[in-house]
Every structure is written in C-alpha cells, then in structure tokens.
A protein has these predicted regions:
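Acidic, glycine-rich A-domain
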Residues: 1-154
Length: 154
C-alpha cells in the first residue's frame, strides 16, 4: 500500500504497577538502563496506551507526566509514510487528551523542546534538572487548582 501506517512493533514496559510498593520495584526500575530493551519512539501510541491504563483506574484524579528526550521516531514507518506521520499522530493524541479526557497531561523535555506539543510543558537541558522539573510541574498544576478554587469561592 501507498501509506501503510505504523510498521514497527511496540513495546510498552511497566516498570512499577501503580499498586505495587516501591521496594518491590527496584529490580524492574533498573531495567530502564539495560541496553537494547527499548524500541523506537512511537510516542502517540504509547500515550494512548498509558492514557487507557489511567482511565481504567478508580482514582479521583489522574495525572500523566511525559518525560521525553526527542520527537517520535520509527525509521521503517517514516520511510513508508510521510515524514510527519508519527508527529501528526502524536499531536492528535495530545489534543484528544488535553481537550476531551479527564486525564491531566504534563510534559518535560530533556534537551528537546516539548512545549511545541504539550500545553503544560517545560524543557530542561540536562537530566540533572529532572527532579526539580518534576516537582515544578506538579506544583504548577496544583497551584492552578488552588487558584481555580479561590475564584469559585470569591
């Protein structure tokens, strides 16, 4: 076919299930550093998968934080489709989540400007800044909520 769609296989890894205690996840978290475990970046489908997992949870509030070091890439898919195929899909998924979903979406780009994709996003230049960026993003989100509450009461 002329435009076959995504051609690469997917690998979604759960390093720590939400209900598992941190102490049981140590070994799994170490797998993040294992060479060859990750596939190419098919970000739109990964977001949808994580989004659906969050929706299945019975929580009052669901927050998804994306940490990205680059744009969606899959050489096979990009060679058989338009060069913007994966990026366009990512933008569609983000738009859906940000406008129609109860899931709150935040993003942090490491050496990659994610503010062009996500409404609530920040870009850092070094992984050493990640801890502060995570806390900052969550603080901003909760401050937004506090401001909304104050405006409702006033």
């Amino acid at each position: 076919p002329g435009t076959p769609g995504r051609l690469n296989d997917l690998r979604h890894i759960i390093y720590k299930p939400a209900d598992a205690p941190w102490r049981r996840a140590r070994k799994s978290l170490g797998l993040m550093l294992r060479e060859g475990i990750l596939k190419e970046n098919i970000d739109g489908e990964a977001l949808l998968w994580a989004h659906d997992r969050l929706l299945a949870r019975n929580e009052d509030r669901r927050i998804m934080m994306v940490i990205s070091d680059g744009a969606p890439v899959d050489d096979s898919t990009l060679s058989a489709n338009s060069g913007s195929y994966l990026e366009r899909h990512l933008r569609e998924v983000i738009s859906y989540i940000e406008t129609l979903s109860p899931v709150e979406l935040l993003a942090i780009g490491i050496g990659h400007d994610v503010t062009r994709y996500y409404s609530r996003a920040v870009t850092i230049t070094d992984v050493e800044q990640l801890g502060g960026a995570v806390v900052g993003q969550l603080t901003d989100l909760f401050d937004e909520d506090a401001n909304k509450q104050r405006h409702r009461v006033a």
